[in-house]
Amino acid sequence: MKILKWLSVADRFYKVYLDKQLAPYGINSSQHMFLVKICGSPGIQQDSLMDMFYVHPSNIVRTIAALEKQGMVTRSPSDQDKRTWNLYPTERALSVIDEIQDACKRTEDILTQGFAEAGQEMFGDFLMQAGKNIAAELHIERKEDEFND
């Protein structure tokens, strides 16, 4: 039960910390990963985010709507499939994405404080494998290597 307890503790408190870091930009710890990906891949299809983040499509729709309302993202219908959207960062998003990524890096640094560099890499690999293990047990399939960083 030690693993479950400390995963829960780390999850709750990193979100509290990251929310405080991201508040000046009008986003939160549930939205940052979407914005980072959209800024790094302008025009990305909204549907592809499901495979990257292991979240339900309705969560993606709500998150993108919130980012759009905050002036961080714009949507346009996909030329290939009119049922989905291509997502683009706004100038506002591009102007703050470096600070957002810095806040994420600081949060990861705090989580891995006291770890050797190799230990930090292993910790990330172990967490990724743990996530894939539980997803597989629940028969949740995603495309491999879509967002392994």
Please provide the spans of the model-predicted regions.
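Charged, amphipathic alpha-helical coiled-coil/dimerization segments
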Residues: 65-128
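C-terminal regulatory/oligomerization modules of transcriptional regulators
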Residues: 118-149
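Membrane-interacting alpha-helical segments
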Residues: 56-57, 86-90, 143-149
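N-terminal helix-turn-helix DNA-binding core of bacterial DNA-binding proteins
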Residues: 16-59
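N-terminal leader segment of winged-helix/HTH proteins
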Residues: 1-25
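Alpha-helical linker/hinge and terminal dimerization helices associated
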Residues: 10, 14, 53, 96-112, ...
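Short, locally clustered residues in the helix-turn-helix/winged-helix DNA-binding domain
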Residues: 8, 36-40, 101, 128
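Surface-exposed, interaction-prone regions with an acidic/low-complexity signature
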Residues: 1-5, 70, 86, 110, ...
